[in-house]
Structures are given as C-alpha cells and as structure tokens.
Curated annotation (Swiss-Prot):
One GO CC term on file: extracellular region
Asparagine amide sites (modified residues): N19
Pfam families: Toxin_36
Tissue distribution of the protein: Expressed by the venom duct.
Family affiliation: Belongs to the conotoxin B superfamily.
Compartments in which it is found: Secreted
Alphabetized UniProt keyword annotations: Amidation, Calcium, Gamma-carboxyglutamic acid, Hydroxylation, Ion channel impairing toxin, Ionotropic glutamate receptor inhibitor, Magnesium, Metal-binding, Neurotoxin, Postsynaptic neurotoxin, Secreted, Toxin
Protein species of origin: Conus parius
Name this polypeptide is given: Conantokin-Pr3
Length: 19
C-alpha cells in the first residue's frame, strides 16, 4: 500500500460522498 494511492482513493471517496 502506497500513501499516495491511499490519499488518492480517499479523495475519490470524499468527492463521491460530496455528490
């Protein structure tokens, strides 16, 4: 697991939750 990927995935979840 890479921190960059984890941060990217977290960003997608936040954006998806926002929509």
């Amino acid at each position: 697991g890479e921190p960059e990927v984890a941060k990217w995935a977290e960003g997608l979840r936040e954006k998806a939750a926002s929509n």
